[in-house]
């Protein structure tokens, strides 16, 4: 009886009219094909942060997107932040977060919390999420394998906040070639062995440059670069490198967006083909950027 029911349902599906929604699905798949072919065996570095980390539905969408990208042969590297969870733990411990120029001021006590949260909690949650969708992710931080060497930022006005002094990609290349997805937290040691908190956008940009990545993609809580930060309709869809610098000089790009645009500029200046600032609050924004003609967010182009 069950077999007869299955056969009947199969016959119904065969005879079911082809709808406009079906046409859209086929069109989307067809549109994706040249991009799948183009980015097979190419490297894309993705900075994962913002609301896409806090909302469970968005989390799952990102993990699925990452698994799909890896499944079709794109060599994915994920660099993650963890600001909201860091703030939650600092609050639990009675430590007030302080920021300067969009970067967290990090004393020794705060650094202990940052390292615990990023490497011990957030990193493993992301690895587990990707693994649950059928791909093999590997959790790392900048300390592992000497991946990143930190240097204290400026004159130490931000405390144990670092910048990237050196990148050693030897640990990453074999993992990527074997189809693993490295998931990297932005904690690294300086030459004197002290742990530093490096802005995750900065780490993503420097890794993209060192790996010769095709793309750098930053997931954010904004539609992209806005000429007016209070007006989503002022989105700049494409911008040249020189124009991005001008927006910083003019004070249009500021606060938390400033380090994001600066890391795009540095990565492009070092050979990355394109950098994208996209809205991680939009479900499957990664796939929309990589596999569609229109893309999403702001594309910063390397020439000009």
From Swiss-Prot:
The UniProt record gives the binding positions of substrate as 82-83, 104, 197
Q: Which reaction does it catalyse?
A: N-acetyl-L-glutamate + ATP = N-acetyl-L-glutamyl 5-phosphate + ADP
UniProt-annotated site: Transition state stabilizer, residues: 47, 260
Q: Which UniProt key words apply to this protein?
A: Amino-acid biosynthesis, Arginine biosynthesis, ATP-binding, Cytoplasm, Kinase, Nucleotide-binding, Transferase
Is-annotated flag, keyword Nucleotide-binding? yes
Describe which pathway this protein belongs to, using the record's wording: Amino-acid biosynthesis; L-arginine biosynthesis; N(2)-acetyl-L-ornithine from L-glutamate: step 2/4
Highest taxon, organism lineage: Bacteria
EC top class, as a word: transferase
Query: Which family does the similarity line name?
Result: Belongs to the acetylglutamate kinase family. ArgB subfamily.
Name of the protein in its database record: Acetylglutamate kinase
Record organism: Prochlorococcus marinus (strain NATL1A)
């Amino acid at each position: 009886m069950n077999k007869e029911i299955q056969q009947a349902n199969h016959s119904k599906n065969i005879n079911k009219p082809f709808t406009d929604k079906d046409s859209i699905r086929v069109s989307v798949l067809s549109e994706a094909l040249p991009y799948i072919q183009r980015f097979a065996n190419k490297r894309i570095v993705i900075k994962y942060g913002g609301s896409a980390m806090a909302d469970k539905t968005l989390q799952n969408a990102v993990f699925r997107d990452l698994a799909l990208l890896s499944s079709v042969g794109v060599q994915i590297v994920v660099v993650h932040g963890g600001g909201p969870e860091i703030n939650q733990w600092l609050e639990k411990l009675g430590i007030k977060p302080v920021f300067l120029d969009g970067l967290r001021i990090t004393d020794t006590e705060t650094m202990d919390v940052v390292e615990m949260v990023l490497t011990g909690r957030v990193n493993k949650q992301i690895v587990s999420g990707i693994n649950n969708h059928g791909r093999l992710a590997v959790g790392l931080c900048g300390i592992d394998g000497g991946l990143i060497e930190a240097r204290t930022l400026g004159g130490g006005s931000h405390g144990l906040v670092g910048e990237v002094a050196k990148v050693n990609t030897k640990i990453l290349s074999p993992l990527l070639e074997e189809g693993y997805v490295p998931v990297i937290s932005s904690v690294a040691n300086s030459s004197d062995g002290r742990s530093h908190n490096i802005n995750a956008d900065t780490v993503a940009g420097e890794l993209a440059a060192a790996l010769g990545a095709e793309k750098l993609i930053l997931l954010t809580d904004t539609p992209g670069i806005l000429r007016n930060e209070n007006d989503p309709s002022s989105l700049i869809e494409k911008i040249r490198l020189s124009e991005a610098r001008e927006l910083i000089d003019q004070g249009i790009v500021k606060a938390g967006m400033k380090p994001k645009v600066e890391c795009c500029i540095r990565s492009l200046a070092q050979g990355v083909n394109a950098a994208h600032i996209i809205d991680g609050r939009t479900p499957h924004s990664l796939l929309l950027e990589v596999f569609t003609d229109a893309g999403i967010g702001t594309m910063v182009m390397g020439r000009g």
